[in-house]
Amino acid sequence: MNDADASIQIQQMVRFIRQEAEEKANEISISSEEEFNIEKLQLVEAEKKKIRQEYEKKEKQVDVRKKIDYSMQLNASRIKVLQAQDDIVNAMKEEAAKQLLKVSQHGFFNHHHHQYKHLLKDLIVQCLLRLKEPAVLLRCREEDLDIVESMLDDASEEYCKKAKVHAPEIIVDKDIFLPPAPSDDDPHALSCAGGVVLASRDGKIVCENTLDARLEVAFRNKLPEIRKSLFGKVGAA
């Protein structure tokens, strides 16, 4: 082989090697581009999924917030309704207390005065029947003292007939009286609309039969009926 043939053969080998290198480089480039596109697509899909999850999370948070807000508004409305109902019921109770106070007011022209005397006697008898003690201590308002003392014999006699026992010893406490009637001058002071409180001599058994206590008991017992009558259904106490 002469130099010319050798040169041609070398050039052919160089072209072959260069062509093969270019093909390999092209394959690598195509493969890299495909891998890049796949990786890019995966990143895009991952970001899309992340955005969707974030949106769903925010949407759920909004729904929960809406439900909480609605529940709070509903509860606030219910509280307002219940408060309004309580205000009406309490206003009725206050009016009943005012009317009850008229029963125990003294005065010649007070047509309730005679009724109050008999009411005091009934309250005393009721306490005696509950206590069933041979000796009791009685407390009343200072302004009711004369009426109470005038009724003791009748009350004791009626108790004896009903309980079939001997007359008890009734000691009227003239040192400590029940609070006076409510006054506009001091509306927050302790007050009593009338009635009596009887206790055993040792003070262990007490029967509170004031008009205030009776009103409280009657009102508490009748409260479901009052609410049903006013609001059409039994409300919360």
Swiss-Prot record:
List the InterPro entries. ATPase_E_C, ATPase_V1_Esu
Q: What is the gene name?
A: VHA-E3
- Entry GO terms, CC: plant-type vacuole; proton-transporting two-sector ATPase complex, catalytic domain; vacuolar membrane; vacuole
Coiled-coil stretches, from where to where? 9-67
Keywords (A to Z) from UniProt: Acetylation, Coiled coil, Hydrogen ion transport, Ion transport, Membrane, Transport, Vacuole
Q: Which Pfam families match?
A: vATP-synt_E (PF01991)
Q: Which family, according to UniProt? A: Belongs to the V-ATPase E subunit family.
| Role description | Subunit of the peripheral V1 complex of vacuolar ATPase essential for assembly or catalytic function. V-ATPase is responsible for acidifying a variety of intracellular compartments in eukaryotic cells.
Q: How does it sit in the membrane?
A: Peripheral membrane protein
**Designated name of the protein:** V-type proton ATPase subunit E3
Superkingdom assignment: Eukaryota
Summarize the subunit comment: V-ATPase is a heteromultimeric enzyme composed of a peripheral catalytic V1 complex (components A to H) attached to an integral membrane V0 proton pore complex (components: a, c, c'', d and e).
Which subcellular locations apply to this protein? Vacuole membrane
Per the record, residues carrying N-acetylmethionine are: 1
This chain's source organism reads Arabidopsis thaliana
Q: Which SUPFAM superfamilies match?
A: V-type ATPase subunit E-like
What are the GO MF terms of this UniProt record?
proton-transporting ATPase activity, rotational mechanism
